[in-house]
């Protein structure tokens, strides 16, 4: 969205319930900031407390309503981008949750009470977007039943990247012993790092292996391949295997 522009979108709540005991529920909406941390976990915080928060740009209605089973309920969200908005992604989330006073306990019967929070996340993109992905390091280790590979990814740009990644482990003869086909990894936010382990459910015999991690950041650059050595010793205590230094190359 351009600085100074405005648009309205609709978030639909579909209360899909077929149980005989389904009842209308009172819900309340609010805004949170959000991010994805270095470990790949989505984190939420109070509105307008995180860098690049878009929470002040949103107005929504209704803030509170009653939803009934079998119906779709709309929340209208108006986004107004300030004229002085900086380039890049600005993030916010519309949170919908059940009102606490809607949770009624019956002291004469056993009950399981579930409270929920749902989030519709927003990426508001202000032009002059940059996506600059890099593979900073690569670590690999073997446990009794798994190979765990941990790449450290970095986005030096100001807009989210959705990398495509694949993984292959070969033995000393160059024969593939385990691999993962290409798939989309977690989003890598602008200015962020991500170190999320990739797990292969396989048991490796003692020996020396080569781990190849290939990544296409889809940022206009060529795919990158990180290579590291994995040494699986004879195990006596079930500890992890050694891992060698990383080598990365652009193809």
Where are these regions (language model features)?
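Short, acidic/polar linear motifs in exposed loop/turn regions
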Residues: 16-21, 35, 83, 100, ...
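Short, surface-exposed loop/turn segments at beta-strand-coil junctions that are enriched for proline
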Residues: 66, 80-86, 201-205, 218
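Surface-exposed binding patches on compact interaction domains or structured appendages
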Residues: 17-77, 164-167, 171-177
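Beta-sheet-dominated interaction scaffolds and their linkers
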Residues: 1-23, 64, 133-146
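A short tyrosine-centered beta-strand micro-motif
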Residues: 90, 94, 207-215
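Short, solvent-exposed loop/turn segments enriched in Ser/Thr/Gly
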Residues: 4-10, 73-75, 86-93, 145-149
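Short edge beta-strand/loop segments characteristic of extracellular beta-sandwich folds
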Residues: 10-14, 78, 148-156, 199
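Short proline/glycine- and polar residue-rich coil/turn motifs
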Residues: 2-3, 65-73, 185-194, 220-222, ...
